[in-house]
């Protein structure tokens, strides 16, 4: 068990209702540059699963102290379901930049489940009509 840092505790304390204190990143990837020229969702799941074993932050979840007498603690969750945390979705048609931004905004507006490790990743396909993006590319949105 480890106490939340002051910054982590601050983010948690000021989060209320629609004011979510989440940090996120969005990357766009061309799977043709992967070894073999393709990348399957199962390979991405395997990658995250291997990183979960090496990186404690992917396994930590919150435990509150009764009556709020102290800052919450991080505990190591040994039973993290990678398929809960890494999700596979596709953009609705036409699959353009606007649709990608709408989807990312929707995902970002959802609170993380505080009973699980505090992260989610989304593989977003269907970017074929985003100008300047190679057809068949996908986005990785992680928060």
Report each predicted region and the residues it spans.
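Non-catalytic N-terminal regions of enzymes
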Residues: 1-143
């Amino acid at each position: 068990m480890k106490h939340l840092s002051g910054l982590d505790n601050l983010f948690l304390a000021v989060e209320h209702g629609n004011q979510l204190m989440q940090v996120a990143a969005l990357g766009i990837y061309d799977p043709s540059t992967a070894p073999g020229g393709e990348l399957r969702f199962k390979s991405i799941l395997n990658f995250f699963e291997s990183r979960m074993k090496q990186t404690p932050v992917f396994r930590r979840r919150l435990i509150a102290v009764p009556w709020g007498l102290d800052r919450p603690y991080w505990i190591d969750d040994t039973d993290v379901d990678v398929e809960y945390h890494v999700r596979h979705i596709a953009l609705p048609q036409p699959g353009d930049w606007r649709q990608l931004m709408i989807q990312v905004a929707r995902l970002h507006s959802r609170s993380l489940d505080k009973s699980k490790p505090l992260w989610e990743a989304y593989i977003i396909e269907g970017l074929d009509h985003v100008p300047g993006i190679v057809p068949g590319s996908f986005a990785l949105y992680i928060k």
